[in-house]
Amino acid sequence: MDDAERWNRRYKTERRYSFEYPRKLLTDRADLLPSHGLTLDIAMGLGGNAGFLLEHGLSVVGVDISYVAVRRVKSEYPAIMAIVADLNHFYIPESTFCVITNFFYLQRNLWASMINGLVADGVLFVECLLERMLSIHPEINPEFLLKPGELKQAFDASCYDGKIKILQYHEGWQEDNTSHPRATASMILQRIG
């Protein structure tokens, strides 16, 4: 079964809070969102983050591999420009987005494209699972998990000629959801000038 089939099946059969609501990192730091502009939601799923951005007056491009997810998002939020695409073959245009969100989707070769896709002063929200998740979910493919410190190191300002600034970083177990514990690395950064 390929990724698209797996996600289509999952979105057809599972009803989970986490699929339909915005991530806490985004809602807690809504103060960083501009009043207008174009945003990109990578691996948008059922549109929780995309809907939140739209409700804050932003235009939203949402990309997901699942046509089931995209169809559901479009029925709830017709204004979202939703794209069915495999992110392994997706091009992020340079200097286009004021906000990019990337929650629980790890594709390391997209990181530089996300930075380059931001306009000056644009903000990137990233949150991915850590290898620590293997202690409670050994079935997870380690390829899709971050090593300790990996996210912060990958976005070190020196790697991007000083054109980014980390605004917030956290690594560890999320304490707000005890029924579904998650070890995550989360970061908010801004592109400078």
Please state what every model-predicted region is.
Residues 106-117:
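A short, conserved alpha-helix within the catalytic core of class I
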